[in-house]
């Protein structure tokens, strides 16, 4: 049974983390992921308005602590940009985000690696390395988790070898890791019907020691589509059984496992409670020795 299982959770005015905590409790989560502000903006309210202390008091009643908190960095920064001004902006935004993570007690910050705009993939990867080393040097504790990407357009991070290239060049290895998104992994061409192959890919191209967070998502598209279109659990092309067996792996089941499946204003957060219940029900009957 996954120890840290939850979903994307809303974080917004007026109650911020208090409302996030209430939503997490309502869906019976043991983990949660939030953006500390609008996902497509670097704007953040002062930390003292985010109500983390009160939120943690609520979470404590359900034995949830900061080990289950994951923060997602804003989408607007491209840490792989060749533009010096955009690099400096990325450093500034990411540094501020990690400082907020430190105050919030968040161990992991998920980051999209960026795009190779008007440059080669290797040049973009080198720019990402440069930015990350500077940010890590300015900050402490929180681990930056590079998210695996589906391969749309100029995205970097569509292959674990690219992310390992970056990790190998980060000075402080304790501050860098990977967030594996199952929809992105599938859409990039990894076939979850061959779990032995999936685990071998992780072992040979990355190493399980760098796997820190799982985004548990279904996909609306075929393997290798490079589309990045999430589907709800048990309603996609990867297969519920394949996803469950994937997260049952001994080196995965204890990581924060976060659902980012589709929700609307009409079914949030109830849809996540239903999916978490489905996952736990599967684990209650799973017999690994029989498979």
From Swiss-Prot:
It comes from the Bacteria. SUPFAM superfamilies: Xylose isomerase-like. Zn(2+) 1 binds at residues 72, 112, 147. It is an enzyme of class 3 (hydrolase). It catalyses: Endonucleolytic cleavage to 5'-phosphooligonucleotide end-products. Belongs to the AP endonuclease 2 family. This is Probable endonuclease 4. Endonuclease IV plays a role in DNA repair. It cleaves phosphodiester bonds at apurinic or apyrimidinic (AP) sites, generating a 3'-hydroxyl group and a 5'-terminal sugar phosphate. Keywords: DNA damage, DNA repair, Endonuclease, Hydrolase, Metal-binding, Nuclease, Zinc. Its EC number is 3.1.21.2. InterPro entries: AP_endonuc_2, AP_endonuc_F2_Zn_BS, Xyl_isomerase-like_sf, Xyl_isomerase-like_TIM-brl. Zn(2+) 3 binds at residues 184, 228, 230. Its cofactor is Zn(2+). The lineage of its organism: Bacteria, Bacillati, Mycoplasmatota, Mycoplasmoidales, Mycoplasmoidaceae. Signal peptide: none annotated. One of its GO terms (biological process) is base-excision repair. Gene3D superfamilies: Divalent-metal-dependent TIM barrel enzymes. Binds 3 Zn(2+) ions. GO terms for molecular function: deoxyribonuclease IV (phage-T4-induced) activity; DNA binding; DNA-(apurinic or apyrimidinic site) endonuclease activity; phosphoric diester hydrolase activity; zinc ion binding. HAMAP family: Nfo. Zn(2+) 2 binds at residues 147, 181, 215, 260.
